[in-house]
């Protein structure tokens, strides 16, 4: 996969760029980033090490801002086997490296 999504919708790309630049995601006038700071439920943050859509630092920063005491940060990919945004869903190894840890995270909290 490529490091970014090819031919993204310009409006979506602009929203993501604004979110990354301002470090705040605002949707329909609601500052989602501020609301997440009071989020208490378990958090699983998954990102690819070469994600060009939501860079790892951005994903990690928002997870770090959340109030939950039950946080799992799952960075996928290595220098020799990088993961971009789309790789998280359809990349080689996604089943084992992404979906199995997600299932485990959910299963341990639903018991």
Regions found by a protein language model. Name each.
Residues 39, 45-47, 51:
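Short beta-strand/loop motif that positions the catalytic acidic residue
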Residues 17-35:
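Active-site nucleophile elbow and catalytic-triad environment of alpha/beta-hydrolase enzymes
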Residues 7, 11, 57, 97:
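Conserved active-site and cofactor/substrate-binding residues in soluble primary-metabolism enzymes
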């Amino acid at each position: 996969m490529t490091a970014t999504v090819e031919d993204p919708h310009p409006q979506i790309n602009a929203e993501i760029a604004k979110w990354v630049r301002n470090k705040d995601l605002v949707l329909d006038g609601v500052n989602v980033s501020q609301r997440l700071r009071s989020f208490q439920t378990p958090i699983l943050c998954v990102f690819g090490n070469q994600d060009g859509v939501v860079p790892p630092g951005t994903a990690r920063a928002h997870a770090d801002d959340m109030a939950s005491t039950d946080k799992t940060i799952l960075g996928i990919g290595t220098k020799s086997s990088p993961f971009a945004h789309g790789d998280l869903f359809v990349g080689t190894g996604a089943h084992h490296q992404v979906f199995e840890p997600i299932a485990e995270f959910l299963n341990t909290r639903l018991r």
